[in-house]
Amino acid sequence: MAHSNAYDVIIIGAGPAGLSLARSLAGTTLKVAIIDPASEQTLKNPPPDGREIALTHYSKELLQEMGAWDAVPEGEIFFLRSAKVVDGTSPFELHFETPDKARGKPADTLGYLISNHHIRQSVYSQVEHQANLTWFTEQKVQTVGATPEQAHVVLTSGEKLTAALVVAADSRFSTTRQQMGIPVD
């Protein structure tokens, strides 16, 4: 029979955003749950998915503070020297060049380009055995909802979780967000 588990924060999705949030809560007294349909082995060694993430200098600092930056293979960090932003058929575009300074320090790059799976792997390595963090791997969210008192999540296994806060970090096509009626423009 399913039983209730109370948490302070439930994070739905173990991608870069969900894992980074979990890592940022390390060292607190908060009881955190993280739910993801992938297996523990897949989270530990995610396969390449063809996505590359452009990181700012601030994102690099955050990953450094988490201890995750050094876990990214050095040969897999690529430097961005410039960028161009276009919007469909619009004749307008934005150009960004390497600034002289970034975050108050001399800069030799606009930012960094790293494969999504390397970011996931590096941040996962920092949260894998984190205290006060419970993993629900190979699980999907069946339903999610909220009352003024708390949020509740039911997993496909039938297990029921409650928390003061549920974070929908389950992709830009978040089914959690859709179930909660949160629009995206």
Residue spans of the language-model regions?
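A short alpha->loop->secondary-structure connector
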Residues: 183-185
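Glycine-rich FAD pyrophosphate-binding loop
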Residues: 26-51
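N-terminal FAD cofactor-binding segment of flavoenzymes
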Residues: 47-88
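Conserved N-terminal helical subregion
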Residues: 78-179
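Short glycine-rich hinge loops at helix-strand junctions in the catalytic core
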Residues: 29, 67, 132
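Short, flexible hinge/linker loops that cap or flank conserved catalytic cores
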Residues: 2-4, 160
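N-terminal Rossmann-like FAD-binding beta1-loop-alpha1 element of flavoenzymes
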Residues: 6-34
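Conserved Rossmann-like nucleotide-cofactor binding loop
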Residues: 17, 40, 173
